[in-house]
Amino acid sequence: MKILFISETFPDAAHPTTGTYNLALCRELARTNEVRVISPRSWIDVVRGERAQLGDDVRSSGVEVAYPTRWYTPSFAQGYYGGQMWWSMRSALNRLTRNWKPDAVLSYWAHPDGECGLRAGQKFDAPCAVIVGGSDVLRLPKDPVRGQCVRRVLSESDSVITVSDGLLESCLALGIRSDSVRTIRQGIDSRTFHSGDQAEARARVGISLATGEKLAVWVGRLVGLKRVDLLILACRRLKERGQRVRFCLLGEGPSRSEWEQLAAAEGVTDQIHFIGPVGHDRLADWYRAADLAVLCSDSEGLPNVLRESVACGTPFVSTDVGSIREIAEPQFSELVPSGDAEALARGIETVLNGSHAEAAKQFVPRTWTETAHDTQALFEELISRRKSPGVLPRDLKQNSSAH
């Protein structure tokens, strides 16, 4: 099968941690299919001299990738973002498909990426599916302009793939037909993310802790809705209570400077360490080195970083948002209310003083092989339905629900 994948959320040499889950899915699909990717890059980055190049992980994936420049109007005329992205990627699309016609089109993020997937499906008369990741169906629909775009993309796509049951319910609440929405959970690369010796992992990442000091990791993009300010305030409370916890923040983003200043104002610069971006293959050692992982976002879908953490034998504390509850088994995790620094501090204390780490080491993750299998099976159904109109789709085996 020839599969065209469209999404801005995809890694390159300068941004190796962006959309690693999409690369993992495409890599696994490419084992039995031909996969080509179009991942537009903002013209603002290009003007700054940041031209996307293939990273080693993408180059070794067996997937052909194009990074066209995305021309758009920042912050206004957002209803035209889909059309602007489509216009921007036309040359790359024509080049990738000159002697190669896709049998199926897959996109990630409802708008504008999903609109481009929808247009590509129409252009090539191929079934199209869009993967929704979280805020695109939790927050964007509240916008009067982009909300209409999201609903149209989800309604007109042949299938909508959600990464959690909670997001599936959100799609249904938007009026999307139930027979067009499927939950296919993301996987974990168990060859990389598995438990191991903590001391050896700490040596590999260059961390040395004082006697009695604990290590917590936070992984993500440093943007407002990730609420790292809450983590900083929780850290101050823990320090005041005599808890010695070092927080290593792995990632980059526009809010870093603001949060560095907050950490200084709260007197916790010795506990809060901004590490910067870390390659996806190196994250496993950070998880193994840590005593727990933390997320404190106001909004999430079903973040893979938490399952990667548990797959490495490390429990987590997270705000109870999005679909996180679906994977938050109480024996290896603690959920706390969003926006509450004191509750976050108490949750961290609970995990550090409990037996959560032992339980985390028993976790068996779902693999990307399973995710790719379910995705390919869905496309086979959609293609079969086009060849035999009126035939109802058979149920997909939802083996993802077991993990």
Positions of the model-derived regions?
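Conserved donor-binding/catalytic core segment of Leloir-type glycosyltransferases
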Residues: L4, L209-K226, I232-C235
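Short alpha-helical donor nucleotide-sugar binding micro-motif in glycosyltransferases
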Residues: P277-V278, D285-A290
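Carbohydrate-associated surface elements
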Residues: R41, G166, G187
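Conserved acidic donor-binding segment of nucleotide-sugar-dependent glycosyltransferases
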Residues: P330, E334-A341, T350-N353
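A short helix/loop element that forms part of the nucleotide-sugar donor recognition site in Leloir-type
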Residues: G49-D56, H194-L209, H356-E358
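Aromatic "clamp/platform" in nucleotide-sugar-dependent glycosyltransferases that forms part
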Residues: D298
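Short hydrophobic beta-strand element within catalytic cores of glycosyltransferases
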Residues: P315-S318
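N-terminal subdomain of nucleotide-sugar transferases
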Residues: M1-D57, G390, A402-H403
